[in-house]
């Protein structure tokens, strides 16, 4: 299993990157966000999809984007093509905010997703626990504090998604408000 590839960009074309790793060139399918973020060199976190007669690599410049993609392809009716369209349209944080807010209209803006698919994705993603690596240490401290109060980790992560504060006390208060609304 390939976890990641680091190399020089050999060619970029239409959502695919040819990556030269020690004179072996790999074809990576990438989101438009990853496509536009890389220049001459890159490190890509890899998801391999192996089917009967096909072996495909999906590359992501960001670990959280890979985690989102991996979660999406586990959903009914969401294959790699739709998952990549989601990753091309929204950042992982924005997508999780859409799920937390049940914003069906935002989902319908994604190519390949109609009203039925949007409803199904909202319902099924609500059951998944996707924990992104946060650069903000306040996120982790708030998560621990709320877990010690007995809240479910998945509910806490949903509540913390979208809170943009570097103040621990304020973050916990805002998350508690969201969590208390879910209880009622």
From Swiss-Prot:
A single Gene Ontology CC term: Holliday junction helicase complex
Gene Ontology MF annotations: ATP binding; four-way junction DNA binding; four-way junction helicase activity
Location within or outside the cell: Cytoplasm
Residue ranges, annotated region (Flexible linker): 135
Superkingdom of the source species: Bacteria
SMART domains in the cross-refs: HhH1
SS bond list: none
Domain III: region residues: 135-184
Keywords: Cytoplasm, DNA damage, DNA recombination, DNA repair, DNA-binding
Main location: cytoplasm
Family matches, as InterPro entries: DNA_helicase_Holl-junc_RuvA_I (IPR013849), Hlx-hairpin-Hlx_DNA-bd_motif (IPR003583), NA-bd_OB-fold (IPR012340), RuvA (IPR000085), RuvA_2-like (IPR010994), RuvA_C (IPR011114), RuvA_C_sf (IPR036267)
Region Domain II, residue ranges: 62-135
Domain I: region residues: 1-61
GO biological process: DNA recombination; DNA repair
HAMAP family: DNA_HJ_migration_RuvA
Comment text on domains: Has three domains with a flexible linker between the domains II and III and assumes an 'L' shape. Domain III is highly mobile and contacts RuvB.
Record family assignment: Belongs to the RuvA family.
Role of this protein: The RuvA-RuvB-RuvC complex processes Holliday junction (HJ) DNA during genetic recombination and DNA repair, while the RuvA-RuvB complex plays an important role in the rescue of blocked DNA replication forks via replication fork reversal (RFR). RuvA specifically binds to HJ cruciform DNA, conferring on it an open structure. The RuvB hexamer acts as an ATP-dependent pump, pulling dsDNA into and through the RuvAB complex. HJ branch migration allows RuvC to scan DNA until it finds its consensus sequence, where it cleaves and resolves the cruciform DNA.
Self-association state and partner proteins as the record states: Homotetramer. Forms an RuvA(8)-RuvB(12)-Holliday junction (HJ) complex. HJ DNA is sandwiched between 2 RuvA tetramers; dsDNA enters through RuvA and exits via RuvB. An RuvB hexamer assembles on each DNA strand where it exits the tetramer. Each RuvB hexamer is contacted by two RuvA subunits (via domain III) on 2 adjacent RuvB subunits; this complex drives branch migration. In the full resolvosome a probable DNA-RuvA(4)-RuvB(12)-RuvC(2) complex forms which resolves the HJ.
Protein's name in the database: Holliday junction branch migration complex subunit RuvA
Species this protein is from: Nautilia profundicola (strain ATCC BAA-1463 / DSM 18972 / AmH)
């Amino acid at each position: 299993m390939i976890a990641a590839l680091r190399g020089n960009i050999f060619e970029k074309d239409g959502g695919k990157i040819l990556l030269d790793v020690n004179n072996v060139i790999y074809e990576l399918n990438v989101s438009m966000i990853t496509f536009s973020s890389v220049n001459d060199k890159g490190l890509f976190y890899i998801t391999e999809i192996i089917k009967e007669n096909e072996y495909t690599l999906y590359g992501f410049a960001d670990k959280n984007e890979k985690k989102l993609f991996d979660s999406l392809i586990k959903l009914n009716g969401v294959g790699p093509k739709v998952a990549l369209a989601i990753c091309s349209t929204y950042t992982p944080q924005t997508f999780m905010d859409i799920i937390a807010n049940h914003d069906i209209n935002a989902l319908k803006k994604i190519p390949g997703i109609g009203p039925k698919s949007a409803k199904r994705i909202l319902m099924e993603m609500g059951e998944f626990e996707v924990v992104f690596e946060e650069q903000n240490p306040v996120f982790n401290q708030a998560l621990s504090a709320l877990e010690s109060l007995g809240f479910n980790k998945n509910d806490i992560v949903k509540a913390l998604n979208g809170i943009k504060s570097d103040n621990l006390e304020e973050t916990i208060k805002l998350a508690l408000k969201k969590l208390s609304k879910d209880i009622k």
